[in-house]
């Protein structure tokens, strides 16, 4: 299961999209109720696994940034590994303390500031950008970043394919890893 929000060791810690799941071990509850192995992770961490596995992003730092009219977030690949952070909150750009705009017209500028903060902190070689909603102006987003940051900080910008498709593909990768880990534990490898 891919969830928008912070997920740590199978527990949804904080999800604005699904607040009723906060602090619940969803995987454990579903396992107990249906007898199925359930894996749960952050949606961007899941999608980032696709880029990690099927691209040449094994060296250096790559940031995947997804943004829309009401949400934004990022996934981070560092030297071939997806960074989740100590509490699963790596990439949760909503935690960066910036002014939140009241009107939708400021959304691009707001997302630009958040992405600039990530670029300044992580200094990635590339940023892959997903548009979560129709009508988002990625050219404007990139233009704002280029106008405000020093040229040596600017990464290569790429447009992501389809965020939701990458989430589904990423779930298969997470399941594959989970099954292998479960087998190793059961067989004492």
Residue ranges and their predicted role:
Residues 2-5, 67-68, 130-133:
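Structural motif
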Residues 2-52, 59-60, 141-148:
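Glycine-rich phosphate-binding loop and adjoining helix at the ATP-binding site
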Residues 13, 17, 67, 114, ...:
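A general structural-boundary detector
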Residues 24, 94-95, 185:
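Short amphipathic alpha-helical leader/targeting segments
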Residues 31-124, 135:
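Glycine/GP-enriched mid-protein hinge/lid loop-to-helix segment characteristic of carbohydrate kinases
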Residues 33-36, 56, 98-189:
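ATP-binding/phosphotransfer module of carbohydrate and carboxylate kinases, centering on a glycine-rich
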């Amino acid at each position: 299961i891919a969830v928008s929000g912070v997920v740590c060791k199978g527990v949804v810690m904080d999800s604005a999209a699904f607040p009723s799941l906060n602090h619940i071990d969803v995987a454990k509850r579903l396992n107990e109720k249906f007898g199925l192995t359930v894996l749960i992770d952050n949606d961007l961490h899941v999608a980032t696994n696709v880029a990690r596995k099927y691209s040449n992003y094994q060296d250096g730092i790559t940031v995947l940034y997804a943004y829309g009219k009401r949400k934004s977030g990022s996934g981070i690949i560092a030297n071939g590994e997806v960074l989740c952070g100590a509490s699963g909150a790596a990439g949760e750009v909503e935690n960066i303390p910036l002014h939140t705009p009241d009107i939708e017209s400021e959304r691009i500028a707001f997302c630009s500031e958040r992405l600039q903060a990530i670029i300044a902190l992580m200094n990635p070689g590339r940023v892959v950008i997903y548009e979560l909603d129709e009508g988002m102006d990625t050219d404007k987003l990139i233009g704002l970043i280029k106008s405000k940051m020093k040229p040596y900080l600017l990464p290569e910008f790429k447009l992501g394919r389809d965020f939701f498709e990458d989430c589904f593909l990423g779930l298969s990768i997470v399941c594959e890893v989970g099954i292998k880990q479960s087998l190793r534990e059961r067989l004492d490898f």
